[in-house]
C-alpha cells in the first residue's frame, strides 16, 4: 500500500440568513463533536457586550482591514451591514494542516471566494422553516426597530436566493433534528476514503499484510 500524506482536516462553509439559527447550531455542534472549531474572523464592526477580541472576532479598524485585503491575507472578505468581515488564509491553513476540521460562518459572497481557493470545502446552507418563522425570530430578539427588521428580512431573502450554490441544505425547523443532520454530515465526511487512508494507514497496512502460510 502506498504511503499516504499526513491527514488534513476538512473545511466547512456554513451560511444562512440572519435568524435561521446558524450560530446556535454551530455552537451545539462544537459541544457534540470533537476535533472541529470555528475560524475566528476579522471584522470592523464594534465589539458587543460580552465579546472578546481574538475569541469572538479579531476586531480591527477599517484602515487595518483594507491593508490586510491589499496584502492578500484573506481567503474571503465581504461587506455586510456596513461592516467588513474577513477570514485569515494563514490561520485556516494552519488548522487544516494540523488535522483540525474548521468551520467558516460566512455569507454567500464569502462562500464563493472560499470555494475558489479550497475546492474540496464542504458547503452547507441553513434555511428557516418559513418566512413567517424567520420574521418572528428576528423580531423576537427585541434589539431592532421595525425598519431594521424589514431591512434584515430583505437581506435574508437575498441571502436565501443563493441556497442552490451549496452542496447541502438543512432546514432548521426542529433544532435537535437540524443538529443531528449537521452532525451526520461531519461524521460522514470523516469516513471518506482519502481521510480514512491517511488517518489509519498503520492499521490498514497491518490488516492487508501478507498472512504467512502455516505448515
Curated annotation (Swiss-Prot):
Residues that, per the record, bind ATP: 16-23
Catalytic activity, EC: 2.7.4.8
Recorded GO MF terms: ATP binding; guanylate kinase activity
Alphabetical list of InterPro entries matching this protein: GK/Ca_channel_bsu, Guanylate_kin-like_dom, Guanylate_kinase, Guanylate_kinase_CS, P-loop_NTPase
Superkingdom of origin organism: Bacteria
Compartments reported by the entry: Cytoplasm
Reaction(s) catalysed by this chain's protein: GMP + ATP = GDP + ADP
Keywords per UniProt: ATP-binding, Cytoplasm, Kinase, Nucleotide-binding, Transferase
One matching Pfam family: Guanylate_kin
Entry-linked Gene3D superfamilies: Guanylate Kinase phosphate binding domain, P-loop containing nucleotide triphosphate hydrolases
Cellular component aspect of the GO annotation: cytosol
Similarity comment: Belongs to the guanylate kinase family.
HAMAP family: Guanylate_kinase
Cited function: Essential for recycling GMP and indirectly, cGMP.
Name by which UniProt lists this protein: Guanylate kinase
